[in-house]
Amino acid sequence: MQKYNQKQNSELRKKVLQSLIVASTAYVCTFGGDNAAWASDYTGTDTLSTGAWGASYDKITITMDDPGKNCAGIYTYGRNNTTTATERVTVTLSDAGDTYGYNGIFVDGVSKLDAKKGIELTINGLGTNNQSGEAQAWRHGLRIETQGKVDLGTDIGSVITINSNAAESYANGVFVDGSSAGTGSEASIKGGDLTVNINKDNVMQQMDYAAGVTLYNGSKMELAGDLDIHLEAAGVDGIRANNLNYSGDINTLQVKNLAIYGKAVNGSGSGIYLMGENDSANVSDSTKIEILGEYNVYGINIDSTGVTGSFGDTELTLTSNTANNTDVRGVRQWESATEYGDLTITARSVGADITSIELNGKGTINIQGDLKIDAQGNGRYVEGIEANSLGEVKVAGKADIAVGGENDGSVMYGVYAQEHSKVAFADDARITTTTHAGNSNTRMYGIYSRTDAEVAFAKGLTVKNGNLGAAMIAEGGKVEVNMAGGNDVKLEGTVGSSAMYNSAHELTYGTVKINFDTAQSYFSGRSYKTEGSINDLQFTNGSYWDMKGNSSLTDLTVGKGSVVNMTADSGRYCSLQVDNLTAADGTFVMNAGAVDGGGSYSDKLTIDKNSAAGTNAIKIVSTGGLEAAARNHAVLVKGAAADTKFAISDSVYANGLYEFDITLADKENDGKYDWVIGSLGKTTVNSVDVMSGSHRVAYGAWVEGNGTLRQRLGELQSGADNGVWARIFGGKLGGDEFTNKYKTYQFGYDAQAGDWLVGAAYEYSDGSLNYTSGSGKNKIGAVSLYGTLQGKDNSALDIVVKRGRIYGDMDIYGKYSDQGDYSTDATSIGVEYSKRFDGGNNVYFEPQAQLTFGRIDGYDYISNKGVKVAYDDLNSFIGRLGIVAGKAFSRGDVYVKASVLHEFSGNSSVTMLAANGESYSADKDYGDTWLEVGIGGNITLG
C-alpha cells in the first residue's frame, strides 16, 4: 500500500491486516433467530450463517440496521459448504451513530457461495463514531478467504455499494485472500458484470482509503462481463494485488471490459496496482481508467517482476492537484510484460512529475494499435516514454506524444531510453514539446537515447519543439529514423550524438542516422557530434535543412534538389563541419558580406576527410558588404577533393541598390581545395533607375507647366475680354524611363492696369506615371502672376512669375520592389517678346522669343526599404524661339505654331544610401534642345 496521506503509511497497512484477522474470528451478531429455518426465500435482519453442508435458497434478502462489531450479512464457512441462491441476493447493512467493521458477504474456509442471479450488496456506514477498536473501521463488500469461492452468475450484473461517513475508515469492494492454496485451490470469484461503488456521490468525503478489488496471496477473479469501479476517498486503488506472506503465489484477473474512476480527495490514487510476483491481469476488450488525486497518481502500476498483463484498447486519464514534487504515472512496470490495443494517456499535474509510460528492468510493453500521449504538468519533469535497463517498448500503430508545461526549470522528454533498453515505432510518430510563451529555461528533448539504448522509427517522424531545444540526442545510445526511406521526416531542434559512460563504467558512443528523402521532409536546428560518435544525415529528393547555428556531422548527404540552408540562423555566420560529404547536385545556401567580430566574411563548409565527386550549387544570401567579402576572397568551402566542384547558382541581391554576379575560384591547399569568392560584378537594380528617374519626372512636369499661360496671354493680345477665366487640358510626357499622362485645371482673373493687362491664376496638375517596372503619381499645385504690355506696333511683352509645389510617389514592382514618396518647391520667371505682322486677308505672322529661369529645390526621402534618396537643387534656364501663323475671323481665329527650345542649364545630382550600406550617386544633365509644334484656335461664343 502506498502512502496515501498523512495518516496512511506503514501503520495503516498493519491496521488493515489486523482488522482482517479480527474480522475472521469474532462475530457478535453471527447467530440470529432468522438462521433457524430454511425456506425458498430467505429474509432476515441478522447474519445468515451457513456451515457444514451448506444451504439452498431462491432469493436471499438481508437487512441489518446498526449491526454490531465485526458483523457480516452472510457468512459461509466449512469445507463442503455450498450456499446457493437461485434468485437475487440482496444484503443491506446500515448504521447512523456508532460504526464498526463490516463484511457484506464473507465466504471462508473452503466454502462456496453460488449466487446465480448475482448480488446487490449495500453498506451505508453513515455513522461517524468509530467503535471498531481499530484505527480504521473497515468495510468489505464481498470478502473471500482460505480457498473460498464465489460464483455471481452471468445472467444479471452484480452491484456492490459502500458508503462511509467515518473519517477513520477504509473499504474494499471485493477482498480476496487465497492464503497460498496453490493453483486450482485459490480463493476465487467469477461471474458476469460487476459494479463496485465506494463513496460515489457521497457528500461526506472523509474515508481514509478505498479499493475496488483486492487480490492477495494467490487469488483469482474471472468475469465474463465488465468490471466497473467508482471510488472516492482520501486514497484509492481501483484494483490491488499482492502476495503479502507467501512466495510463489499468483493472483489472476480476467474481465471483458474494465472501467475505473478514482478520486483521491486527500491522498494518492491508482487504477491498477499489482505488487505480487508473476501476477496476471487480462482485459479482453477495453480498459478505461480515470484517477484524480492530491498526491501520487498512477494509472497502471506494476511494482513487481514477472507480471503479465493484457488490457485491450486502453484509455488512462490522470490528474494530480498538488504543488508538491510527487509522481503521476500512466503505465509503470518492473520486469514485466504487458500488451495493449490502442493506448491513450492524458496526464495533468499542478506540481507533480509526470511519466506517461515507465518501463524498468527486462520487461516489455507491446502496443499493438495507436499510441496517444498528452502530458501537461508543472513539476520537475514531464515524460512521454521512459525505458530503462533492458526494457523494450514496441508501438505497432501511429504514435502521437505531446509533453508540455509552464515550469520554467523543468525537463521534458518525448522518449527517454537508457541502459540497453529499446523503443521501436513501426508506423508514423509525432512528438511535440511545448512551454510558455517568451524566453524559457525549460530543457526540452524530443528523443533522448543513452548508454546503449536504441530508439528506432521505421517510418515517418515529426518532432515539434517549443523553444527549439533538442529534437533528438544520442548520448551513448542510438537513434535511427526512416532507414528504409519513403516517409516524411520533420524535425525541429538540435540533433546530437556524444559519448557517455554506462552503469558498468564503459564508454559508449552515440549514433544518429536520419534519412530525409521526401520533398516534405526537413530539419530545422543545429547538429553536433563528439569524437567517436556518429551523426549521419541524408537529404535527398527535395528535402532541406534550415541550419540554426554551428553544426558538425560525421556524414552528410545532399542530393539533387535538396538544400542545406546555412542562413537560417539570422545575424551570424555559421560553420558546418563534416567528416564525409556525399553530394550530387545539392545546394548550399550561405551568407556572405561584411566582416563579423571573428573576422569572417561568410558561412563556411569544412570537409575534414572525404568528399564525393560532383558539382554542388552555392546560393549566396547577403545583407550587404559583398564587395568587402570579394576583396578579401571569403572562403566558402574548405577541404574539398579535387573532383568536388562548387558553383554560384544565381546573381545576388542584397536588398540594396545592386545585383551582384559572383564567380568562385578554387585554391589548392595541402592536397585539398578551398572555394573562395574570386570576382564580383555589379549592376544597379531597376528600383534605382525608377527612383533616379523620378527627378526627371518632376523636372519635365514643371518645365512643361511653364508654357501653360501662353495661351491666355495670346488670347488677351488677340482682343479677348479680360476677367474671370478657366481652362482644362491634358497631355502626355514621356521618354525611355517613364510616361506621364496628366490633366491640368486652370482658373484665373485678369484686368486692365494702365497700359498693362495683369492677372493671377492657380493651376493643379494631376499625372499618372508608368515606369518599366512600376507606377506612380505626379501632382503640381502652383500660383502664377502674369502681365502683358501691348505695343502700338503690334508687339507684346509678357512676364510670368510662378511658384508651386511638386508631389510624387512611386510603387516599384517585382524582385526589387520598393515604395517612396517625395515633395519639393519650385519657382520660375519667364519673359517673352513677340510682334505680329499682317499678311493680308486677316492672315498674320507672329515671331516670338522667350527666356525662362526656373529652380526646383533639392529634396530627400527614405523609401520603404530604408533607401535614403537625396537630390540637389536643379536650376533651369531655357530659351525659346518660335513663330505663330494664323487667320482671324469675326468670332475668333485658328493658328499653327512651332518653337525650338534649348536648356542652357538643367544640371543636378542624386545620391542614394541603402540600409545595407550600398551607395549610388549620379550627375543628371537635362540640357537639351527640342522642338514644339501645335495647332489651335480661339472662338467667341454668344
Identify the role of each PLM range.
Residues 4, 38, 584, 589-595, ...:
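Outer-membrane translocation/initiation segment of Type V secreted surface proteins
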Residues 34, 40-48, 56-71, 82-101, ...:
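Beta-strand-rich solenoid/repeat architectures in extracellular/passenger domains
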Residues 210, 269, 382, 412, ...:
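Transmembrane beta-barrel architecture of outer membranes
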Residues 681-845:
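Outer membrane beta-barrel translocator domains of Type V secretion systems
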Residues 772, 809-813, 857-865, 906-912:
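Outer-membrane beta-barrel and related beta-rich outer-membrane complex signature
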